[in-house]
Amino acid sequence: MDIKGIYHADANRYSDAEALYKRCGKSGILLPKISLGFWHNFGEVDSYERSRAITHYAFDHGITHFDLANNYGPPYGSAEETMGRLMKDDFKPYRDELFISTKAGYDMWEGPYGNWGSRKYLMASLNQSLKRMNLEYVDLFYSHRYDPNTPLEETLQAMVDIVKQGKALYLGISRWPLEALKFADQYLKERDCPLLIFQDRLNMLDHAPQENGTLDYCAENDIGFISFSPLAQGLLTDRYLNGIPADSRMAKEHFLKHSALTPELLEQLKKWNAEAGERDETLAEMALAWILQQKGVTSVLVGASSTAQLEKNMKCVHAKTLNS
């Protein structure tokens, strides 16, 4: 930022473009291999100036994709409000250089219409999201989860209509079972709104998208794939190799339980950490590189609590090829 506090993006932000970007499926969209997730660290309870510094660093280094959802915070909606404030304060001149996504599918407000995959919920949720983010449209809108009680046609047609209304440019789905993914792919293609991307958990400890055929289906049908929770809530870092830090997620036992760190897992993590050291990488860098080197993967969603953490994570783009 200049002396008046006005943000000016780094003139060299695309200098590493050849290494950083990858085509998403068969679309015209190139996504950064590392995308910035707003699940944590961008809520009302978090420092706005820190959020600002992280997004500045990201964009200054070519990370153009910011991933949000209606219920990110806490509290719900506050990550999108932070994005709206960032747009107003810093990123409005760069809107056409950003690829912003949001989602709807989990509980957001009280009553029968604030959850799941109904047309009413999806339409209302996106309208609210756009207001919070000070945007006329999002680049990508997701169904955040599969709804077993709403006809898939209702959910998908609502998403098609959202594109037709100009409120989203592309469509994605997250964590749908394979058969529902196949149905969505065909339904959307027939309506000239092809599925851009699928989002799911994939990391060195969780291979479900590979084991259940989802990743292969995406690769074979020109659908991008973006991984969340790439570091398994911090397990795939050096944070827990010598005990449980008092300020860690595992110490709070909210998303990550003590029971997750079994003696067998700890032994495996220490082996991987040693392997990473032999590669002159941290365990986190190697874990991110592993995902990016899997067939069919377009991008990895990372969170960041500091610019230093984001800087370290970005090194995986230039990582050496892993043996397996």
What are these regions (language model features)?
Residues D46-R50, S78, T82, Y113-Y121, ...:
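Alpha-helix N-cap and loop-to-helix initiation/capping positions
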Residues Y57, H61, M133, Q165-G166, ...:
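Structural motif
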Residues D2-E18, T150-N323:
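Beta/alpha (TIM)-barrel catalytic core signal, keyed to glycine-rich beta->alpha loops juxtaposed to Asp/Glu
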Residues C24, L36, S51, A58, ...:
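Conserved, mostly hydrophobic/aromatic
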Residues G25-G43, S101-G114, Y137, Y142:
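N-terminal small/glycine-rich loop or linker at the start of catalytic domains
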Residues M1-L98:
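N-terminal binding-site loop/beta-alpha segment at the start of enzyme catalytic domains
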Residues E110-Y142, R201-L205:
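Active-site gating/metal-coordination segments in enzymes
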Residues V45-F59, G117-M133, L181-D185:
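Short, acidic/polar
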